[in-house]
Amino acid sequence: MFFVLSPAKNLNEKDPAPVSEFTQPDLLAESDILMQQLRELAPQQIAELMHVSDKIALLNAQRNAEWNTPFTPENAKQAVFMFNGDVYEGMDANTLNTDQIQYLQGRVRLLSGLYGLLRPLDLIQPYRLEMGTAFANLRGKNLYEFWGDIITNLLNDTLAQAGSNTLVNLASQEYFKSVNTKKLRARLITPIFKDEKNGKYKIISFYAKRARGLMVRYAAEHNITDPEMLKNFNYEGYAFNDAASNESEWVFMRSEQIK
């Protein structure tokens, strides 16, 4: 069983990682192709392409200019500790022990517009390139065309090497679109997290993102290898709802008063 997650726009570049172990991204040669093109963009072009402020555009122009290989602990940081959004706050990898970090490394993969597919301990340098960005490149009009089946093939290889036949999709639609599900050689399970509001259960983005990270933390803390055991996930008041679920979409609900 493997999990896939989206990355985060917010990055923690300052705090040192709590572990020294690191690996290198498998698709760094592809990242280098993209970065060569990104470096050609002026800050104003970045602002228009990514729909960000001038300040953020300037920051990322500087990041692009400084991006260089090889990655080392001195100029890069492990992805799971660099990403700093709602999902990663829910996971809170900084407080996991060594065995639990190894669980993440062995069973979690992070989708990325620039890096394709990352292991949690893969070193990365700061960047901003969301998968849904309409960034015309050498292979097409956007990043989905750039990556093609590269991410899917690496996922299939990863699953095969581990003897696994299940992929738990905890990524956003924007990122999971980079995976060709028709060519994916695995059973696909997509957990859905719903919160009660005014008597109705609905997906609330902030809570759903945090819950994705919480589920990965739950799996690591309980060393889960059987997907069925994920139905016992109960962090922060969530509970599996069998009646609302089907074989591929597992729904977890949380009542309003529990928060």
From Swiss-Prot:
It comes from the Bacteria. GO terms for biological process: response to hydroperoxide. One of its GO terms (cellular component) is cytosol. Belongs to the UPF0246 family. NCBIfam families: PRK02101.1-1, PRK02101.1-3. This is UPF0246 protein NMA1114.
